[in-house]
Amino acid sequence: MKNSILTILAVCVIAGCKKNESTAVNQSTDTVATSAPVDSSRPILDSAAISGTTSDTATDLSSQDKQFADAAAKGGMMEVMMGQLAAGNSTNATVKSLGDMMVKDHGKANDELKKWASTAGYTLPTALNADQQKKYDDLKSKKGAEFDRSYTDLMVSDHKKDIAEFKKEAAEGKEASLKSFASTTLPTLEHHLMESEKAKASVK
């Protein structure tokens, strides 16, 4: 009788163990079944690819691009500053009109260049160089016909220089957007040169 009881208990224990093992296996299987499958063929995108941007744009600029961008930024600032002087200080209607045109057109070009720089991740200069500052200070100190002669002389010489620099960038630049800026701005500069020569001829 005692042996029979022990046998029954042993059978119950074994049956219980098998049931627990079966439950554990089923739970493990369910967990695997409900997990999302991993597709190893899907590409893994980095942050640059997701955003569609890269931090290498500015470093990819050629020395020609950088030199042009810097010169155009400083030259554009000077044209606006001198144009403001002409519009406010000159008593010659032609010279005043020339100054207004410089402020408007170069202000627009400066904004376009700043937008390009922001997109390219390039830092433009925010002040005139020493030579440009001296030219501005000298012009600011002049009055009347002397001012008009100095201003129109500067506009003729500066725009000849600007046109040469913009043509060089359009031909030799590497960055497409900056080359396009140079090409599309050239007709405006050529018009400025023509108007500057007319204004210079009107000054007595």
What are these regions (language model features)?
Residues 2-6, 11-204:
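His/Met- and acidic-residue-enriched segments that coordinate or traffic transition-metal cofactors
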